[in-house]
Amino acid sequence: MLPGDVLLVSSVISYLGCFTKSYRVELMDNFWIPYMIKLPDKIPNTLTKEGANVLSLLTDDVIIAGWNNEGLPSDSMSTENATILTNSLKWPMMIDPQLQGVKWIKNKYNKTITTIRLGQDGYLDLIEKCVSEGRVLLIENMPEDVEPVLDPLLGRQLIKKGKAIKLGDKEVEYNPEFKLFLHCKEGFIYNHLNLIPMQL
């Protein structure tokens, strides 16, 4: 990847997830790409050419077909969302009233996923187990107000040189294979997360 490609791809992953398709296109076509073209010292890239697809650098037809087989809808917005979701360093929050993204995530990780809702019996123990064993955790129907005990997890605030995380009064061993997916049906925003609107 050329430096300009890295700049555009990282911008898409970091900032576009929470926007609608039309606003994503507007930002790319009317702001970001024209800005890159007008720079006096051009940054080498392949993405300012007509018809270039930023996310094609992160995925291909085989990966997309796999996602579709796992239940992801085949429209371009869902493909963009999945690409952003799978490449983000922040935990993704899926705004998903129709449960399209939830269905896909459950199918994609069907053998290793644990699904919980905050407040259910023993949910903190399940979170600790997933974190320490490197499992995939899906928290469904996230409330607008999240318990402060989860802040270190949402913000990936690792301690002991990245080997542990504090959950409440416990230090839990952090397995780097751990993955967290969050789901809500409403569009409230968390600063620690990468929002992915999965509605059609």
Regions inferred by a protein language model and the residue ranges of each:
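Conformational switch/transducer regions in large eukaryotic molecular machines and scaffolds
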Residues: 1-200
